[in-house]
Amino acid sequence: EQLSSERVLFSVATDYHQQLETYGSLIRQIHQARVSAPPLMGWWSWTAYYFGLNEGAALTNAQWEAEHLKSLGYNIFHIDEGYQYARGEYITPNATLFPRGLAPLEYKVRGLGLTPAIWTAPFEISERSWVYQNHPDWLVKNAKGQPIHAGTVVDNKDQLFVLDTTNPEAQGYLRKTYSTLVNDWGIHSIKMDFMDDSLIEGYYHEPNTTALEAQRIGLKIIRDAVGDNVYLDKDGSAMLNPVGYVDYGRISQDTGHTFDASKEAAPGIAARYYMNRNFFVADPDAFTVSTQTIDDQSWHESNKPATLDDAKVSIALAAVSGGMFEIGDALPTLSKAPERLALIQNQDLINMIRLGKASIPLDLMNFAPEDEQPSIFFLKEDDRQSILTVFNWTDKERERSINLTTTGLPASGEYAISDVLDNQKIAAVASGVLAFHQPPHSVRVFKIVDAHVSATAPAVRTEHPSAGNAGSTLTFVAHSQGGDAVLSYHWDFGDGITIEGSDVKHTYTEPGEFKVQVTAAGLSGLSAEDHFQLRISGYMPTTFEPQKIKRFEPEK
């Protein structure tokens, strides 16, 4: 007798963290996960304006981000739902809010040095959309041949249906939509929402197609349409199905402007920590730190201003994910709140994101009964420095103590501990136990430095050509080889051009000998350099040669 199944992993061990991380690593290898994308930092519009963002408010927030936050690494400018005419019609703007369309606005956003990003729900089709009005035959159907109803947008408004991704004409429409977003609007990062709601079984154009198969077919069409250099962020969907097509993936439910919203999002971030850099780069949803209220939204009583502790909980929760780091506030509201703006500017939190590693929920399976969910997260940033993040999910003040050996730190260490959010040094740890007071609805983020371990500069190795031709695009790659953890790489190409990144491209326009230098900035403040000589030969041709001219054709 034989049993046929998909690939199965069976493993027994006492260390459940190791088991989860092993599973994540195997998923990365088997499914060729896209995990090399940078941890995006920036702003998104949803929790700031919900359906109400208009052209003027968008530009104001873009200008504010560019002026106050871009230098810190916040460069993503994400417009969420509301810009489009209807779900399923994403290249037709909502003329009430964006009377000149989105392309002129995104042009200005790029001019500010920001990266345009946008929201879509790729497989949902509204009854108001062009597809529903003109091609109901492109939709997933029931046994009677009728389009299957799949819900509403909100409050029973706008009935929704599902695009049949196996229908060749629907595929063409999907391809055109995403190609336009990228090639005409200049979008570089695309969120794909509600893929769980549109995951319905039904009658597809291609018989015997399952909902999961249809979703993979649609994702491949989108990836092929946008190319490899555009970031795709899966939102609501099964965790595993989009792996290999998406760069980022939501690991929690929606957040908002309240402590309760953060508390409800936290279990997902804890339980899925091992997915970061294994399935995709984690998307913990946006954090909010302002006192902004949303009077016409009832989401978790968001009409009440968040306390400073609420704000700290929200941003710390995003930081422990080690993934995306997006601000969900109306940015101008931070101009008169320096203590809240300081949270966004906090270098230790930013470094947690730049390192790209998720904090481990130490109490994932044995959290305190009063917390009702994991509350202790630990990030070993390098051999010398670690971050311990502790949430108080309860309504009561607490006196807490944590034995540092439970984090994996050696008992022999001599630890200097500081409070990251309050910029205060903590008194010496007694017998390896960190004791502290914690108010209700709060978080403490401790930086732990082992004085027995000396700070060392990072070691860096480069992959690069030794020669090239003027006008040709060359690739340069930097790798960390031990020492201090690397936060950033800075390239100087010797021709007046500098670029940030571990994997970069550059084109020289003139021949000559150039000294190329890369500087790796380490976590402890030390840096390392590598340099090499590069010979560029020849000149860029300037003659008219029509036989060499090729007609540009957008990807289909």
Residue spans of the language-model regions?
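Beta-strand-rich recognition/accessory modules
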Residues: E1-A37, P305, V433, Q438
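Carbohydrate-binding surface patches
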Residues: S314, A318-S321, E326, F367-P410, ...
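C-terminal beta-strand-rich structural cap/linker in extracellular carbohydrate-active enzymes
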Residues: V429-T456
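Aromatic-lined carbohydrate-binding/catalytic grooves of carbohydrate-active enzymes
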Residues: P39-S179, W185-H205
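Active-site-proximal helices and loops of the catalytic beta/alpha 8
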Residues: A103-E106, R110, L114-A117, E206-E264, ...
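Extracellular/lumenal mature domains of secreted and surface-exposed proteins
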Residues: D450-K556
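Glycan-recognition surfaces
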Residues: Q133-G172, I217-L334
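Solvent-exposed beta-strand/loop surfaces of large extracellular or lumenal domains
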Residues: E414-V433
